[in-house]
Curated annotation (Swiss-Prot):
Protein name listed in UniProt: Alanine--tRNA ligase
InterPro entries: aa-tRNA-synth_II/BPL/LPL, Ala-tRNA-lgiase_IIc, Ala-tRNA-ligase_IIc_anticod-bd, Ala-tRNA-synth_IIc_core, Ala-tRNA-synth_IIc_N, Ala-tRNA_ligase, Ala_tRNA_ligase_euk/bac, DHHA1_dom
GO cellular component terms given for this protein: cytosol
UniProt organism field: Streptococcus thermophilus (strain ATCC BAA-491 / LMD-9)
HAMAP family: Ala_tRNA_synth_B (MF_00036_B)
Function: Catalyzes the attachment of alanine to tRNA(Ala) in a two-step reaction: alanine is first activated by ATP to form Ala-AMP and then transferred to the acceptor end of tRNA(Ala). Also edits incorrectly charged Ser-tRNA(Ala) and Gly-tRNA(Ala) via its editing domain.
GO biological process: alanyl-tRNA aminoacylation
Domain of life of the organism encoding this protein: Bacteria
Primary localisation category: cytoplasm
Length: 872
């Protein structure tokens, strides 16, 4: 067996399948594009669904890839098992209606066992198969596999409801008796017992049936196009070929673990306690790649996943004695390990480090908040006489604050309390069930649309034309092809067309189709790409359309030109964002309509008003320079050498179009653009907002719409000027400033009157002094307009020796506000208010001499005041 690095394994995999006529599909971004069923790209086939469901026909039906993926369903298992990861690489080979079982099995066995390739010992390989799948069994036998190494397993059948399905055959590597301490042997495989001896390294799915839940599997009908979908985990193959005890002892993780050793001063012992090392090494890989792909930590969706991963890693760092921010220092190591195939981590290292470090520092403050919450929970338990911290509260600490259960247990036991472990497990399971239920399972092969997929007639888009005479080659209506149509809605393909099919954020052209007599026979309401790339015109039929006849196609010129202005402005906006906000602000989505443009981009905070103004000014400067917009067609390598930006989520062929706006912007783009920036006229940002964790959106308008937006603002300003009786618009700021000064003076006068009223009221409050166990205290409900007045009471109380402790409560606008002040060394105001606040259904905290709380139960204010004496 060869000793190969992970990079060598990956490259050998791709080289082997290339030798079998496969095209290499680059690893896609971890953030799915146009797939709401997935939170993350979670498998090698996830990015290829468009090929298997027939919506896109691949140039080559044989595909191979090495795809980075993220799965976080069972995050708690990371580090506890030898092979569980949140981020992993899936090696795959796929056939879309091309080769099937025989080639998949024969070639797979060749790759694994041939001395030219992986050279794994044949006697160490075992295969499982579906019992009724005799063809796979016979094919393995034909390859030379011993019958004793072929294990029938009833679960070896892939199906998710109705649709494509089929048997699968899995390949396992036997690591020997060393990993079978109970000497169970082959029963580990036969009975599907969790073990570390037989390691699954590859799964081959044979999609050949159309599943129908209403009939038994034996009656499933065969698919017209059979497919192959396989997956082999790079981490597992590396562990096997490097002789590593676990995946974590491979060259994919050990450099990270060595850095953690240096930071912690502790040694990684494979035979000892290694959990924290493994969790940190795993999680920083996910963080580095996901942030590099545009996801950012947040409170929902992908952002929540990343925040949780980071917080778990930080807490495990604390277990190793690392108290300062440290995860960000591991990013370069992750980048260096993966650089040969994934250079983007090192390319974006500074940005990734910045995000991780900032999140670590924020979490350090959050830990303090978690400690405060735990203190409050324990204080309430003590007051109620209970001795057990409830599972739901432990889970809230764990889930919201990232507090490990062990830390909660340790601190609670120090205070004499027990832990409700079962309640915590129940809350955890409930959350996991919710998470799993929210994932829409998407298989590799969707329903096949044969009618559209079988359209092979060519169609050419005429970039420069707005009208064209062209032959009608295809009519589709009611999901079937027709020779003619004279009413209703239909899908049309022409040999040539001036109509732009929606793509790359640019909306489709609209327009008309006329016959030889000049009569309009159809109106084009949409244009999309057919599976084989043709422009598929959706039309409302108004006359007769016949396949083979010639028609005049004419786009809506005004609509096209307005869309082009917005599309070119989008390129200018993208470049301005790079210049002003940073290179990390890359496109995450766009829409170029005729009335507006919408641009989504990755950024970790709101764009400031100053930045928005600078962006707007820079874009307009480029417009007013009247720069020519040039478009060339070239190969992808030449385009990249020109510095052209390739946009995330876009699929590029061998030939690409490069759109250049002077030396200001160079992008790969298949859309239509103005010939000169001066045609755009004017650019105005109308809105900037967040649309999700780490993603911002800018709405903008150009040309006439920009002018109208400025007019609307001017009209509003004129209305304000009239109200303020300002004769000129430029005098409005001075008028507003004058009103603000008057308002400030009145507020100051009002505050003075409040202070005098408070002083008068305080005289009565401070007379009501009580004593309990040697502590003099004042506990009173007061009538005030805001919480600030309570602090005014406290300030006056401090000026004289009225009492040792002051407790004030007020009912202000449907809420209860409580203040505790203390001059006594024996009474901690912060601790006292934590005990009192729950009485009014509130919470709070503070320092030894001053604390405040808020609550909602005004009916219990007197109960709170009565409880003060019991605390001394």
């Amino acid at each position: 067996m060869k000793q190969l690095t992970s990079a060598q394994i990956r490259q050998m995999w791709l080289d082997f399948w290339k030798s079998k006529g496969h095209a290499v599909e680059p690893s896609a971004n971890l953030v799915p594009v146009n797939d709401p069923t997935l939170l993350w790209i979670n498998s090698g086939v996830a990015t290829l669904k468009k090929y298997f469901d027939g919506s896109v026909i691949p140039e080559n039906p044989r595909i191979t890839n090495s795809q980075k993926a993220i799965r976080t369903n069972d995050i708690e298992n990371v580090g506890k098992t030898a092979r569980h990861h949140t981020m992993f690489e899936m090696l795959g080979n796929f056939s879309v209606g091309d080769y099937f079982r025989d080639e998949a099995i024969e070639w797979g066995y060749e790759l694994l066992t041939s001395p030219e390739w992986f050279d794994l010992p044949k006697d160490k390989l075992y295969m499982t198969y579906y019992p009724d799948d005799k063809d796979s069994y016979n094919r393995w036998i034909a390859c030379g596999v011993e019958p004793s190494h072929l294990i029938p397993i009833e679960d070896n059948f892939w199906e998710i409801g109705a649709g494509p399905s089929g048997p699968d055959t899995e390949i396992f590597f036997d690591r020997g008796e060393e990993f079978d301490p109970d000497n169970i042997g082959i029963r580990l495989l036969e009975e599907d017992i969790e073990n570390d001896r037989y390691i699954e390294i590859w799964n081959i799915v044979l999609s050949q049936f159309n599943a129908d839940p209403a009939v038994p599997r034996s009656e499933y009908k065969e698919l017209p196009n059979k497919n192959i979908d396989t997956g082999a985990g790079l981490e597992r193959l590396a562990a096997v070929m490097q002789g590593a005890k676990t995946n974590f002892e491979t060259d994919l993780f050990m450099p990270i673990i060595r850095e953690i050793e240096k930071m912690s001063g502790k040694a990684y012992d494979p035979d000892g306690e290694t959990l924290s090392f493994k969790v940190i090494a795993d999680h920083i890989r996910s963080l580095a790649f996901a942030i590099g792909d545009g996801a950012l930590p947040g409170n929902e969706g992908r952002g929540y996943v990343l925040r949780r991963l980071l917080r778990r890693a930080v807490m495990h760092g604390r277990r190793l004695g690392i108290s300062d921010a440290f995860l960000y220092k591991l990013v370069p190591t992750v980048g260096q390990i993966m650089e040969s195939y994934y250079p983007e981590v090192l390319e974006k290292k500074d940005f990734i480090e910045k995000i991780v470090k900032r999140e670590e520092e924020t979490f350090a403050r959050t830990i303090d908040a978690g400690s405060s919450m735990l203190d409050e929970l324990l204080a309430n338990l003590k007051k109620s006489g209970k001795d057990t911290l409830e599972g739901k509260d432990i889970f809230k600490l764990y889930d919201t604050y990232g507090f490990p259960v062990e830390l909660t247990e340790e601190l609670a036991e120090d205070e004499g309390f027990k832990i409700d472990h079962e309640g915590f497990k129940a809350a955890m399971k409930e959350q996991q069930d919710r998470a799993r239920a929210s994932v829409v399972k998407g298989g590799s092969m969707g329903m096949q649309n044969e009618t559209l997929a079988n359209i092979t007639e060519p169609s050419e888009f005429l970039y420069e034309a707005e009208t064209a005479e062209s032959r009608l080659s295809v009519i589709v209506a009611d999901d079937a092809r027709h020779d003619s149509v004279n009413s209703g809605q239909a899908l049309l393909v022409f040999e040539q067309t001036p109509f732009y099919a929606e793509m790359g954020g640019q909306v489709a052209d609209h327009g008309t189709i006329s016959d030889a007599a000049g009569t309009t026979v159809a109106r084009v309401v949409d244009v999309q790409r057919a599976p084989n790339g043709q422009a598929l015109h959706t039309v409302e039929v108004e006359g007769e359309l016949v396949v083979g006849a010639n028609y005049k196609l004419e786009i809506d010129h005004s609509r096209r030109h307005r869309v082009m202005k917005n599309h070119t402005a989008t390129h200018l906006l993208h470049a301005a964002l790079h210049n002003i906000v940073g290179n990390h602000a890359v496109q995450a989505g766009s829409l170029n309509e005729q009335e507006f443009l919408r641009f989504d981009f990755t950024h970790f905070e709101a764009v400031t008003p100053e930045e928005l103004r600078a962006i707007e000014e820079q874009v307009n400067e480029e417009i007013w320079k009247a720069t020519p917009v040039t478009t060339i067609e070239t190969d992808i390598d030449t385009a990249k050498s020109m510095g052209a930006m390739a946009l995330f989520g876009e699929k590029y062929g061998k030939r690409v179009r490069v759109v250049s706006i002077g030396d200001y912007s160079v992008e790969l783009c298949g859309g239509t653009h103005v010939a000169n920036t001066a045609e755009i006229g004017m650019f105005k940002i109308v809105k900037e907002e967040g649309i999700g964790s780490g993603t911002r959106r800018i709405l903008a308008v150009t040309s006439r719409e920009a002018y109208l937006a400025y007019r609307e603002e001017e009209d509003a300003l004129k209305s304000i000027a009239a109200t303020l009786k300002a004769p000129q618009l430029k005098e409005v700021p001075n008028k507003v400033a004058s009103l603000q000064e008057q308002l400030h003076a009145l507020q100051k006068e009002n505050a003075t009157l409040k202070e005098k009223a408070a002083a008068a009221a305080a005289g009565d409050v401070f007379k009501d002094v009580k004593e309990a166990n040697g502590v003099r205290y004042i506990a009173s409900q007061v009538e005030v307009s805001d919480a600030g007045a309570l602090r005014t009471f406290a300030d006056q109380w401090k000026q004289a020796d009225y009492s040792d402790v002051l407790v004030l409560a007020a009912h202000i606008r449907e809420k209860v506000n409580v203040l505790v002040a203390s001059k006594s060394e024996n009474v901690h105001a912060g601790n006292l208010i934590k005990v009192l606040a729950p009485i009014v259904s509130g919470r709070g905290g503070g320092k030894p001499n001053m604390a405040m709380a808020g609550g909602s139960d005004a009916n219990s204010i007197q109960d709170l005041l009565s409880a003060v004496a019991e605390q001394f």
